[in-house]
Amino acid sequence: MTRLKICGIKRTETLALLKELEVDYVGLVFAPSKRQVDAQTAGQLLAAVPGHPPAVGVFVNPTMEELEEVLSEAPLSVIQLHGQETPQFCQQVRERFALPVWKALAVGGEADAALAIQSYQGIVSAFLFDTYDPGQAGGTGKKFSWEQIPALQAACEAADCIIAGGIHAENVGELMGQYQAGIVDVSSGVETDGVKDAQKIKTLVERVKAHEQHSNNYASRA
């Protein structure tokens, strides 16, 4: 079963829609970005929509103090680290805050993402694979070569495998059908002019659910 995360939430109406559509995770970006929110805003946003999907906080090379500040205001369910955080730091974060840690790894740069996984095994709950961009940590809207996904999935072993980068309603079916992605992470793919677009979100969710239903029906007949 594929789970869906919509990242870069800044507005109450968007969060309320994601709750209504039963999206699996919502992402709040605390790193410098056009989608950035501060700790207080995030806390107010989550409080405004009781029963919202589990919130994932996205950070790039944070300090422990920065994480503490955010968590004192916003009830996050997952900490996603999208920078050059070491395995040791990830373990410290997991132990200190008693929350799952997701580690983002870039695909397409000089570093071998599949090789990097090994040093984080047993520490993080999931690996997120996003397209390498020297000037931006995620949210680029660029798709990496999906032919690499099977090798990345194999390297993840027991950890969840999250695919991000350039995903939208027109290609999510291919991603789910050919590669059985565990978690799909979408941000710019449901935006218009940099703002979350309700219709694009609805269309994406419909495509994901339709593909899941088709897969379930096929499995039941097999």
From Swiss-Prot:
The lineage of its organism: Bacteria, Bacillati, Bacillota, Bacilli, Bacillales. Pfam families: PRAI. PANTHER family: N-(5'-PHOSPHORIBOSYL)ANTHRANILATE ISOMERASE. CDD domains: PRAI. GO terms for molecular function: phosphoribosylanthranilate isomerase activity. Belongs to the TrpF family. Its EC number is 5.3.1.24. Keywords: Amino-acid biosynthesis, Aromatic amino acid biosynthesis, Isomerase, Tryptophan biosynthesis. The keyword Transcription regulation does not apply. The gene is trpF. InterPro entries: Aldolase_TIM, PRAI_dom, RibuloseP-bd_barrel, TrpF_fam. This is N-(5'-phosphoribosyl)anthranilate isomerase.
